[in-house]
Amino acid sequence: MRFLRLIILASALWFCGFAVAQRWIPYASATDGFRIMAPGEFAIEEIDFETEYGIVVPARVFSHENDTGRYSVTVVDYRESQRLHDERLREIGALYQPIYGQVDVRGSVAYAAKKIRDRASTIEYDAYHYISRIDGHQLQTTNPDQTRTFAAIYLYESRLYVIDATASPDIAPPGMFQQSLEFIDEDGEVITFRNFPDDRKVSGVVKR
């Protein structure tokens, strides 16, 4: 417990120093359902994202680069995943399983985490995390070029949120960016739950 308290204290001091050195502004996208403290204005790019099971779904990347590093929020939209997997099932038949449409979505956090691990040279932190009782994962890694990545990944209603701050090794950890994500509804109100809503991970699933 003493070691944990030291980590928390050190993190708090880091965050304070970093907040002073860098101007943070709130950014919200009701369309994509999130709000976060950003280090500057985001550039927005729409991309095609190939899932672990090989289908292509739309994603939107919000990114900002400055002299401290690159900061991005990637929102991957898996909401049409089941339909795309059903189309593949009709093409392949018995060689393909109907459940893959749900598995692809439920495994998306682990898949995104693996991609971050694969590009790292060392991993300093790699564990479960949650925000507003929505399950996720956090990682802190060092890359071959000595930059450090502070990442957080969450899945909510078939949308995957990948928070990635890859920064210079000589600045304080950008924890403000990694840990300030909030989920919002179409009116911009913050979404919170009293319990863990497992059924809200994958949208459109028929309950039995």
Residue ranges and their predicted role:
Residues 20-58, 122-123, 131-133, 184, ...:
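N-terminal "mature-domain start" segment
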Residues 37-41, 66-68, 134, 154-161:
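Short, solvent-exposed coil/turn segments at beta-strand boundaries
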